[in-house]
Design a protein with these regions (language model features):
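Acidic, PIN/NYN-like endoribonuclease modules and their adjacent C-terminal/linker elements
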Residues: 2, 101-135
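Active-site-proximal, substrate-binding regions of enzyme catalytic domains
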Residues: 43-70
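Active-site neighborhoods of divalent-metal-dependent phosphate/nucleic-acid chemistry enzymes
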Residues: 72-115
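Short, well-structured N-terminal submotif of metal-dependent ribonuclease cores
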Residues: 1-37, 51-61, 135
Length: 135
């Protein structure tokens, strides 16, 4: 694994959060390309609709833009589900964070960018990085 980045939902959320100092960092990460999962797309749609009050059209446009920048989304499979349960049990993360980590491992990524997980922690060959830690 080398130079393969996976984005947690928070990266996508901040990329569309005008006026937030984290937006520029998130936009730069996404512009470089990387990996996401179907779960990330679904979580983005939920947060964008409920918290950001985006219309369905705006959500669709934002997700289409993300999908042009990223590799095809990793599907949520039974194998990823099982790996996510094992990660949750071993590392104590919530199941949804653990599924993100399992999807990143399945995509053979070496870095997952997330604000919500422990910066610098390694899960197998995967390293968690908080790109906003210095803001």
């Amino acid at each position: 694994m080398s130079d393969r980045s996976f984005f947690d939902t928070t990266i996508l959320i901040y990329a569309v959060s005008a006026g937030d100092p984290r937006a520029a960092v998130a936009e730069k990460l996404l512009a470089a390309g990387g990996y996401i999962s179907v779960q990330v797309l679904n979580e983005f749609a939920t947060v964008a609709r409920n918290k950001l009050k985006m219309s369905w059209e705006e959500i669709g446009e934002a997700l289409a833009a993300v999908r042009t920048l990223c590799e095809p989304p990793t599907p949520l499979t039974v194998g990823i589900h099982d790996a996510g349960l094992a990660i949750a049990a071993q590392y104590g993360y919530h199941i949804y964070d653990s599924l993100i980590l399992a999807a990143a491992l399945d995509a053979e990524c070496d870095t997952v960018y997330s604000e919500d997980m422990q910066d610098g922690q390694k899960i197998g060959e995967l390293t968690i990085r908080n790109p906003f830690a210095r803001l």
